[in-house]
């Protein structure tokens, strides 16, 4: 009889690196131009007035101002930057 268990294979035992998605600047906070407002996978939230969208669907500020979230067309969420 074997006195050690066989080193069987396993399908588990690994983990992916964190992606740090989500809102980075909350509604009502003051941001400067170029500040990342939120990181997302796909366009869950769309850019509104004075907000731009990056290649990876990151939404960022185009001007200095205050972040506001609202429901846009077809009840889709949008992010606007109001000038201060």
Swiss-Prot record:
Q: Which GO terms describe its molecular function?
A: structural constituent of ribosome
This protein's source sits in the domain of life called Bacteria
Location of region: Disordered: 1-21
A cellular-component GO term for this protein: cytosolic large ribosomal subunit
Listed A to Z, the keywords are: Ribonucleoprotein, Ribosomal protein
Kindly state a single biological-process term from the GO annotations of this entry. Answer: translation
Q: Which InterPro entries match?
A: Ribosomal_bL27, Ribosomal_bL27_CS
Gene3D superfamilies from the xrefs? 2.40.50.100
Which HAMAP family does its entry note?
Ribosomal_bL27
Which family does the record assign? Belongs to the bacterial ribosomal protein bL27 family.
Concerning NCBIfam families, the annotation shows:
L27
Q: What is this protein called?
A: Large ribosomal subunit protein bL27
Gene assigned in the entry? rpmA
